[in-house]
Amino acid sequence: MTTYGSFPGARPRRLRTTPVMRRMVAETRLHPADFILPAFVREGVSEPVPIAAMPGVVQHTRDTLKKAAAEAVEAGVSGIMLFGVPEDGKKDAAGTAGTDPDGILQVALRDVRAEVGDELLVMSDLCLDEFTDHGHCGVLDGQGRVDNDATLERYAEMAQVQADAGAHVVGPSGMMDGQIGVIRDALDQIGREDVAILAYTAKYASAFYGPFREAVGSSLKGDRKTYQQDSANARESLRELALDLEEGADMVMVKPAGPYLDILAKVAEASDVPVAAYQISGEYSMIEAAAEKGWIDRDRAILESLTGIKRAGARNILTYWATEVARTLR
C-alpha cells in the first residue's frame, strides 16, 4: 500500500520536473517594480567617471544621470536613489554643500525630476558624509565625536532643500537617534507633507561598504561604529524599527542586505510599513569580481542574490543591477 505522507508516495521532485512546473510553483518572483537604482552624480566632470572598485558603475555627469533615469523608467524600475559627489574644495566640517540649493545633489534632483516627472520615484540620500571634510555622517564636537543633536539640525535643513529640489522620498542614512521625527517635522513645517521618508532603520557598520567609499569620494578616517549598528546584534534592529515607526517613517530599510537576511526577515515580520533592503557595493563587487574570474555564473548569481533578498521579506531592493535585471525580467 502506498503511503502518501512520506516516501515513496510523497515525491517533492514532481514539482521540479520542468522549467514551466518550477516557474508555476515558485514562491518568490522578482519584478521590475521591486527595484530602486542607486546612482552617483559628480560635480564638475564632463564625462562619466568609472568606479574601479565597482565594475560597470560610474559617477555620472548631470546629462548621463538624466539618461540613466530615463532608462530606468523604460525598464520598469520604481525608483532612483541619488548620491551627490561634490568637488573636494567644497567639503567642509559642517557639510554645507549638502544644504546649498545649488549644490550638486539638489541640482541633480531638479534635473531628474525635469527628465522623468512622476514616472520614477526620485529619492535622495540624506546624509552629510559625502559633503564633510572628515567623512563622518554628522558634525563633530570639540572632542572629534559625532554630535547627535547638532547633526539633527543639519538633517532638518537637508530634508527641506532636498524636498524643495523635487525629491519624492528622502532617505536618512546617518543613523542618528531621533532623525526620523526631526526630519518629518522639518518637512511638514514647509508644507511638504507628501514627501515620504525611507528610514535606514537597521544600518550596520559593515566591511562591505568599502567600494562605496570610493564611489562617493569619502574622506573618512576611522570608522562609524559609534552610530551604525554592531554586526553581532539582532534585537536592537527591532528597537530601531519601533522608534522609526513611532517617529513617522513611511518605509524602512535594512542595509546591507545579503549578510543580514536574518535581520531583514525579523524586520519584515514586525513592520506594518513597506520594507526595503540595500544590496550594497561590496555585495555587488564580490559577484562581479568572481564572475570576471570565471568562478561563478554572473547572471545566475545576480538573480539568486536578489531572489534571496526578496524571499527574506524585502518589498523593494536597492541594487546597482536594477535596470539591467528589470530589462531581463520584462
Swiss-Prot record:
Record flagged with keyword Metal-binding: yes
Pathway(s) per entry: Porphyrin-containing compound metabolism; protoporphyrin-IX biosynthesis; coproporphyrinogen-III from 5-aminolevulinate: step 1/4
Organism: Streptomyces coelicolor (strain ATCC BAA-471 / A3(2) / M145)
Protein name as it appears in the record: Delta-aminolevulinic acid dehydratase
UniProt xrefs under InterPro entries: ALAD (IPR001731), ALAD_AS (IPR030656), Aldolase_TIM (IPR013785)
This protein's GO CC annotations: cytosol
Name of the gene this protein is made from: hemB
GO molecular function: porphobilinogen synthase activity; zinc ion binding
Positions of Mg(2+) binding: E240
Recorded catalytic activity of this chain's protein: 2 5-aminolevulinate = porphobilinogen + 2 H2O + H(+)
Biological processes, Gene Ontology terms: heme biosynthetic process; protoporphyrinogen IX biosynthetic process
SUPFAM superfamilies, A to Z: Aldolase
Annotated residues for binding of 5-aminolevulinate 1: R213, R224
Keywords: Heme biosynthesis, Lyase, Magnesium, Metal-binding, Porphyrin biosynthesis
PROSITE patterns cross-referenced by the UniProt entry: D_ALA_DEHYDRATASE
